[in-house]
Each structure stands twice: as C-alpha cells, then as structure tokens.
Amino acid sequence: SHISEFPVGTYKKAHRHGPGAHLVLLSGTGGYSLVWTQEDRSDMIKCDWQLGSMVVVPSDNCFHQHFNSGTNRARYLALRSGDMGLNSPHGGGGEYADRSMKEGGWQIEYEDEEREIHEIFEKDLKAHGATCRMKAFIPWCTGEVGPTSERET
C-alpha cells in the first residue's frame, strides 16, 4: 500500500500490474481514472471520482491512469493484496511496474501516450476551471509548465 499526492493540472503515467488494486480518494475536488484493456483503447472507460470515491483495477491486463482535474491537490491511498498486487500472470513482479513498455515493463511513458489521453484531460480541466500543468512532459499541451520532475506528478 502507498499514498500518492499530485498537484492540480497533472496526472500519473498509464500503467498496469496484477489485479486487485483499490484506490481510495482521500482529498481533492475532482478528477478521474481511465481504464482500458485493448491496445486501441476501444474499451476505455472514464471513471470520475471525488472525495471518498474508490477505483478498483479489475484485471491483470488492465491499463489505468489517474488524473487530477479538480481545483485542489489530490491524494489517494492505493491498497493492494499481500503480494503488492504487482505479480502478473504475464510474468515478472514489481520490478516491471515502473519500467517503460519499451523496456519490457508495464508503464506507458508520457511521450508514448496517445494524444487523445491528453485531450480528454484538457477538456475535463476546462470544465473544472483549472489549468493544465503538463507542458514539461507533453509537447502538445496547451497549458503551462508546472512540475519538471516526474516524481512531482
């Protein structure tokens, strides 16, 4: 288990791991998670969240990504099974969780994500009256430079 916090107008990298991760939103005024299993994201769903919401990652092959489109910092508690929920029937364990897909890992780097992902985010930010702060990582971002270290997102 761990707690993660991220500023307004930022989001985490898309990733996957073993099933059974549960996220409980501890603070924040709005945001969402995207969840999909198909490479073309044809089955992608947007799960809006608010304070007290729970997001459940349903399966091993499920990519997911978390976005803070609200007006306050967002914090969530990630709960996983005893094996940290990182072991995968596809092989490997937690060492793949923070490794790029290009290196055989389970994480999609910002520069490799589909433009659609960021466009959805900017649309949601606009609806909440917030500004995107991902310009340091996303070349087509129409917002501003915010965090410059991935650890700050």
Regions found by a protein language model. Name each.
Residues 1-14, 19-20:
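A short glycine-rich, His/Asp/Glu-containing loop-to-beta-strand
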Residues 47-70, 79-82:
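Conserved metal-binding segment of the jelly-roll/cupin
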Residues 67-152:
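Double-stranded beta-helix
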Residues 8, 29-30, 62, 81-84:
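Short, glycine-/Ser/Thr-/acidic-enriched flexible segments
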Residues 1-2, 34-35, 56:
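Intrinsic, low-complexity N-terminal interaction/targeting segments
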Residues 16, 22-51, 62:
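A short beta-strand-loop-beta hairpin characteristic of the jelly-roll/cupin
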Residues 1, 19-20, 30, 63, ...:
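Extracellular structured ligand-interaction cores
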